[in-house]
Amino acid sequence: MPFLELTLSCSEVTLPRFQNALDDVGALAVTMLDADADTSNERAILEPGVGEMPLWDRLTMTALFDGDSDALVVLAALEAFDPGLDWSQVAFRMVEDSDWERAWMDLFKPMQFGERTFIVPWNHALPEAADTPEAAVVRLDPGLAFGSGTHQTTALCLRWLDSLAGSGELQGRSVLDFGCGSGILAVAALKLGAAGAVGVDNDPQALLATADNAQRNGVDAQLTVYMPQDEPVQTYQVVVANILASALDALADTLAARVAPGGRIALSGILHGQEDDLLKRYAPWFDQLRCERDEDWMRIDGVRRG
């Protein structure tokens, strides 16, 4: 059976807190390794004395969760358990048996969001409903477990973009996809009629995935990707941020400053119950703030005050 694997870096000082958090949210197993292994800074721990438990200064922790676990739910629970720890560098992946990837490809079917937006894996024929001039079709690799449209946070954003396109508020507009991941939202926005898009993410692999998906969908000339520190300071008519509630709170000033007067914003990655604080956080800059729910997840959207 597959497992969800979490990896993070910590110090000997913060290790107990990370360990307590992982145990609390249901980790099946936790292992620790020297983060400097196979480098000149590697330190061997051979035979500790009685009652001693020496550890490395820098550690890599790996935790396993049940394969049915939702990575974003796990991460949100960890942040809620100990918000004082830095969870921003946590990485997830599926530890799978040899048949998992093929099973995922078979399970990942074409999906429709709103009236005209379709996410279609490359190994599937185009659905009849998507084979129209009005349809916005994004083709994705079925191996992408996250940012593929299957998670509620992504689905909430895709439906929002589709509704903007339906009301004519996306045609010819500039778009910022903050925390772009696979780039699915930026690519979908371009397919729906946006003039140009910028993807921002702190993971270089995410930027590569976004650029690759843009190229494969024929919109690479309209999309540029940046690390957060390299993003040009400018405003956009449409901003979408599908990250976690803690990051949305911390980045409120930054995200608000990126939205042009009269522009639209959508915030996702918010668990039900976290929306009230974020509504208050963004109220100084945005009117018409409203929420939409999909199972345990919420989206907030609004209009930038002039």
From Swiss-Prot:
GO terms for molecular function: protein-lysine N-methyltransferase activity. InterPro entries: Ribosomal_L11_MeTrfase_PrmA (IPR050078), Ribosomal_PrmA_MeTrfase (IPR004498), SAM-dependent_MTases_sf (IPR029063). Its main location: cytoplasm. GO terms for cellular component: cytosol. GO terms for biological process: methylation. It catalyses: L-lysyl-[protein] + 3 S-adenosyl-L-methionine = N(6),N(6),N(6)-trimethyl-L-lysyl-[protein] + 3 S-adenosyl-L-homocysteine + 3 H(+). Keywords: Cytoplasm, Methyltransferase, S-adenosyl-L-methionine, Transferase. It is an enzyme of class 2 (transferase). Methylates ribosomal protein L11. This is Ribosomal protein L11 methyltransferase. It comes from Xanthomonas euvesicatoria pv. vesicatoria (strain 85-10).
